[in-house]
Design a protein with these regions (language model features):
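Asp-based, Mg2+/Mn2+-dependent phosphohydrolase catalytic module
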Residues: 18-31, 41, 45-302
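Alpha-helical substrate-recognition element adjacent to the catalytic core
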Residues: 1-39
Length: 302
């Protein structure tokens, strides 16, 4: 099974990300890491002629990826670039944003690595790439032609290409599984691209958020962590009386909109509960949010 690690981070080199993952006990090679800079550079290279000028606003990693694609990096709008590609890095200046805006106003195609509005730093939450992108959009009135990062599906599309052998067809979409802990990036990107997805509970998403997720943020599968990849996962099914059953667990919503389950410690119960809650939402039935079970699935490993 081929494994690719995708990240919206556009400033960290693949080797740096790989070293961090290795520190978690994983066996990872840098080529398995797909950053938003890798994806953005490949997008730009397909859109402009080989050797075309590209104005780059971003970290050294983004610049190296653009150069590796055979494109000429320029710094000023006066150099008449065919495209502008914008990422995030902490030393970005007003003049760099202005040059990007001037080039876009002159007709350069506009690409961005991601549109994350914020980025966590040691001292708190700081403006992310998306906030800087919005400055250029505000100045020009032009939206990016494409975004490399999630929740767009481009990163998963590129992963299919990069996982294939040289000259081979991309890995088929139906053979791919997008895995992540964020519904509004990892899972939404999978849904936008038509990929099956697995939401894990080892990060920011909790059971309540899963049960209340709107359609575009719902995963195909739910698990406590990645150990579930090596275990069978029963499919939830709807019974004629309206109950949802998954394995030995079940969930139901009564006439008052209260959701009940028979086991708050089992992942199968959470899977059934999500199906019951999602069905009620899609049918326009009221769901008593205060009645949502407080699942305790830490360590369930299912």
């Amino acid at each position: 099974m081929a494994i690719e690690y995708t990240t919206n981070n556009s400033s960290r080199f693949q080797s740096v990300v790989a070293d961090q993952l290795i520190g978690f006990g994983l066996s990872v090679e840098p080529r398995q890491v797909i950053t938003s800079s890798v994806v953005a550079a490949r997008m730009v290279a397909r859109a402009v002629p080989h050797g075309a000028k590209v104005l780059v606003v971003g970290a050294e990693h983004l610049r190296e990826e653009i150069a590796w694609q055979g494109l000429e990096i320029v710094e000023r709008a006066e150099d008449d670039p065919a495209a502008v590609v914008q990422g995030w890095y902490p030393d970005m200046t007003w003049n760099q944003l202005a040059q990007a805006a001037f080039a876009v106003e002159r007709g350069a195609a506009y690409y961005v690595t991601n549109r994350d509005l914020t980025i966590p730093r040691e001292l708190g939450i700081a403006p992310g790439c998306g906030s800087m992108v919005q400055a250029v959009v505000n100045a020009t009135g032009v939206q990016p032609a494409a975004c490399a990062g999630k929740p767009e599906s481009a990163m998963y599309d590129e992963a299919r290409l990069l996982a294939a052998a040289d000259g081979a067809e991309p890995v088929r979409r139906e053979l791919c599984l997008a895995i992540g802990d964020r519904l509004d990036t990892d899972i939404e990107a999978g849904n936008r691209g038509g990929y099956d997805s697995l939401a894990v509970l080892t990060g920011v998403t909790n059971p309540h958020e899963l049960m209340l997720a709107p359609r575009h943020l719902r995963p195909t599968f739910i698990a406590r962590d990645l150990r579930a990849l090596n275990k069978p996962m029963p499919a939830p099914r709807r019974e004629p009386d309206g109950r949802w059953v998954c394995g030995r667990c079940e969930a139901a919503i009564d006439a008052a909109g209260r959701l009940t389950v028979n086991d708050v410690t089992a992942m199968d119960a959470l899977r059934a509960a999500c199906c019951a809650a999602w069905e009620a939402s899609d049918d326009g039935r009221a769901l008593d949010a205060d009645s949502l079970p407080d699942f305790d699935v830490i360590g369930a490993g299912e």
